[in-house]
């Protein structure tokens, strides 16, 4: 197996002759990508909410969050990609990993801003993006930056029409360590 990895990494032709077996992933239609994105997103939430994750579950949570976002890239809007990046940032924040949490929270905001410009965003996307940045900064120990993003998220709550949506983000904001 190591020989195969070396051969492939050197750019040599694959020793697998069947193109179906040799392909990394089969072609999926948009519906399949969307279904996988949603299912993986929901699976990640079960692991985020689990108090006593094993090392294997932590790995699953990280990989599934990235995979969900990957599939949104094939079948979603900028808003979907922003939500995927938000979830990845949340995963890393839960794990106390500030650098990737910051990276993905910033990517979330960029996608959400693009989605707003394209008319694709829901009224809660901006507040959620700001919440993700506030959480990432809190994990990094940057209290002033976290407070700045938290204030922006709080201001953005006023744009959310559905009280249930607003309450979810208010709860997320309240749970951010100070």
What are these regions (language model features)?
Residues 18, 55-67, 98-107:
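Helix-turn-helix repeat elements of alpha-solenoid scaffolds
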Residues 35, 57-60, 80, 100, ...:
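Structural signature of alpha-solenoid helical repeat junctions
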Residues 42, 87, 125, 132, ...:
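"A position-specific structural signal for the A-helix of alpha-solenoid helical repeats
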Residues 66-70, 107-117, 151-162:
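Amphipathic alpha-helical segments of tetratricopeptide repeats
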């Amino acid at each position: 197996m190591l020989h195969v990895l070396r051969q492939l990494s050197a750019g040599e032709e694959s020793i697998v002759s069947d193109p179906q077996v040799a392909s990394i992933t089969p072609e999926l239609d948009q519906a399949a990508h969307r279904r996988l994105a949603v299912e993986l997103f929901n699976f990640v939430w079960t692991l985020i909410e689990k108090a006593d994750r094993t090392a294997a579950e932590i790995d699953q949570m990280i990989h599934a969050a990235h995979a969900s976002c990957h599939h949104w890239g094939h079948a979603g809007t900028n808003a979907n990609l922003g939500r995927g990046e938000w979830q990845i940032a949340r995963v890393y924040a839960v794990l106390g990993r500030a650098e990737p949490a910051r990276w993905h929270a910033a990517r979330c905001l960029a996608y959400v801003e693009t989605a707003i410009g394209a008319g694709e965003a829901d009224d809660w996307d901006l507040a959620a993006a700001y919440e993700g940045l506030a959480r990432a900064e809190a994990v990094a120990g940057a209290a002033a930056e976290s407070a700045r993003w938290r204030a922006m998220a709080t201001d953005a709550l006023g744009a959310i029409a559905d009280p249930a949506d607003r309450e979810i983000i208010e709860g997320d904001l309240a749970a951010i360590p100070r």
